[in-house]
């Protein structure tokens, strides 16, 4: 039916009902490091099941962001860092992952040009939750870019 309606190839994927995470990555190649893992927790009044545009744009009322350090979160960090390096991403960005029914993290997307709005973008939010300033985030991004350019 989807092929008939849209008249182009359609990608159908299984819904991942588990926890949703995002991890910041700073650096390039072997020098890349993962930030702490942030879990995206939707509040009762949020659109259910997904970190939608509406939920993100109204995050103060609809979303709770929290840093998590359990075993699943550690797997998320390792997967995110491995994907970042494998894709050849540089300097700074963000990886989104969501767990399946059994709690196994699945890669959803890479954001190699992650938003940098100090209050509304996930990468600065992670840094803030880690007790770091927006200026420290920008400093780390600039340091990575300068090192990469100087190492050419």
Positions of the model-derived regions?
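ATP-dependent carboxylate activation and anion-phosphoryl transfer catalytic cores
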Residues: 70-152
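Phosphate-binding site of ATP-dependent enzymes
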Residues: 1-72, 99, 104-106
């Amino acid at each position: 039916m989807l092929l008939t309606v849209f008249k182009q190839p359609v990608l159908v994927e299984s819904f991942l009902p588990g926890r949703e995470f995002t991890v910041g990555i700073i650096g390039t190649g072997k020098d890349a490091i993962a930030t702490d893992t942030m879990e995206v927790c939707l509040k009762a009044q949020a659109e259910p099941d997904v970190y939608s545009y509406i939920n993100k744009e109204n995050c103060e009322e609809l979303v709770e962001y929290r840093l998590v350090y359990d075993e699943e979160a550690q797997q998320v960090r390792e997967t995110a860092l491995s994907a970042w390096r494998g894709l050849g991403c540089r300097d700074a960005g963000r990886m989104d992952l969501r767990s399946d029914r059994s709690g196994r993290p699945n890669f959803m997307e890479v954001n190699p040009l992650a938003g940098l709005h100090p209050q509304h973008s996930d990468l600065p939010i992670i840094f803030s939750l880690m007790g770091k300033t927006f200026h420290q985030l920008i400093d780390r991004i600039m340091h990575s870019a300068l090192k990469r350019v100087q190492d050419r």
